[in-house]
Amino acid sequence: MTSKSLNAWVIHKQWSGDTSARLKLFTREMGLINCLCKGGRTPKKQSLLQAFIPLWVSIEERYDQYYTRNIESTSSRLDLEGHSLFSGLYINELLYYTLSPDFPDPDLFDAYLFTLNGIALAREREVIEALLRRFEWALLKACGYTFSFLHEARTGELIVPDSYYQFVAGEGFILGGDKKIPGEHLLAIAADNLSESAYLKSAKFIMRQAIDHLLGGREIKARSLYGPA
């Protein structure tokens, strides 16, 4: 049996039988993993097996199945409520539906941690929106789906501030089109400038289409609660 220690967050939980829980954990060391937690219904473990609690988890692999051995919290549960809570549920759903199992990406894990801590502290919706847009971009990169905010997709020419572009999912930005985005906005987003509401609105529009393309038709339920993307 191989034992591993992981930094983890619970992304999804499903009860299994009378005593156990099936978990989907997002970990720094192994990415997204599925594991069985025996005794998961005990009061102590139920208090730990919740979203937004940073965990240290020891697992072992037997017959191509991961089992938890020990679970401890490394800090208290993040205080998420209202828009922050719905946003946390949103990014958890994104991870659940887009990541392949056992594919570690420490940069994405760090982005997840940064985003959760940021939305827990945020007091303005615009701040939360900007954090979500940056996380969505980190997720797109982790999944190998990126596009240039600096170059026109079909010609390779530089984006011009005074020109208008249309976003084509799976391709990038093309000059003209029906749904026009100012080149100025694209260059601002490329520079990570989401301080103006117009830039943030364009980033939201672009990321919504890009994420939907990545999801391949899967529905994100948290959008109906908050509509963060």
Swiss-Prot record:
Alphabetic keyword roster: DNA damage, DNA recombination, DNA repair
GO BP: DNA recombination; double-strand break repair
Keyword 4Fe-4S belongs to the record: no
Top-rank taxon: Bacteria
Gene Ontology CC: one annotated term: bacterial nucleoid
InterPro entries: DNA_rep/recomb_RecO_N, NA-bd_OB-fold, RecO, RecO_C
Keyword Cytoplasm applies: no
Protein name: DNA repair protein RecO
Organism whose genome encodes this protein: Legionella pneumophila (strain Corby)
Family: Belongs to the RecO family.
Main function: Involved in DNA repair and RecF pathway recombination.
